[in-house]
Structure formats: structure tokens, C-alpha cells
Amino acid sequence: GSYISVQNAIMALIVKSANDVATVVAEHISGTEREFAKLMTKYARDIGMKNTTFKNASGLPNKAQMTTARDISMLSHKLITKFPKQYDLFKTEKFNWNGKIYKTHNRLMQSYIGADGIKTGYIRASGFQLAFSAVRNNKRLIGVYFGGDTGKQRNQRLSFLMTKAFEGLDIISAKKASIKIKD
């Protein structure tokens, strides 16, 4: 067998969605991937993810496995707020392992102003997916998109939606600043 350090395993999961590494980590932690998925589902319930059931560590297809964009946004928010040091890893655009450089699938990290990370995914049933976070003017937005036909389409649509949401926040802030209170 091969060996991989915990740090490199984490980077492989974040940057390249290394499904084989997800299985190895799950088996190391819980004995089996199935037991690990049960722990993941329990944690999901504990943080309010009511519509998520995990059946494996990687997110690869399983008829009994499901989630929603809302639940993934809750998980993303929890990661950002409860584990800021670990969340910082989700900004990583590339890493080197065994002399090879691996690059992220999250192209918005390079092109979207204020981007600070999170995670891509893909399965045939729900297409190209992305949980994405950006900060502008000290305001953070988390966007989750499922169903892209291509990674490029997913990125364009989520970029558009995030930009519109930030513009909406700016309008709300401007309105609040212009409200006059009568004495």
C-alpha cells in the first residue's frame, strides 16, 4: 500500500475531490466508509441539515444519498464560522504531492472579486455543483449551485447570482444609511 500524510489527504480532498482519499480517510476514522457516512449524517442533523443523508464519504452516487443547496449552505456557513483556520484551506488553488502539481476545479477563485473559497463537485444526476463564498465590503455571501451542464456554465451562473446578491446588499445598506429619524 501507499501512504499519504493527513495534510496531503486534506489537500487532495479539497483541491481535487479525490474520492479514493475520501474512502481511505473514512475507513481510517470509522473502520468502514458506511460507519463514517453515519457519523456525517449525524453531524448534519446536529447542525440543522434536515434534508441530507450521507451514504459514503465522497458524495459519489448512491440512491439513498441526498442533500439540498440549503443544507450545503448551512454546512459551508458552519465551516466558515466554527473552523476558520480549516476553512482557510479551501482557498487553496493548487498543491504539490509526489512531484506533481494539482490544481483546483474552482475557477471562480481566480476570477471572482472577493472569492475566499469552498468546494466544487460533480455527479451525473445533479451536474456540476459549487458551494462558494465571497466577501465584499465586509459582507459575506455563500452561494450554492447545483445542476450546471458544464463547470463553465456553473461558474457563470453562480457568479451572476452572487454579483446580483451583493448589489442587493449595497442597495439595502444605502437605503439604511439614508433613513432619517424624526425627533
Where are these regions (language model features)?
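Active-site-adjacent loops and short helices of periplasmic peptidoglycan-processing enzymes
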Residues: 1-70, 80
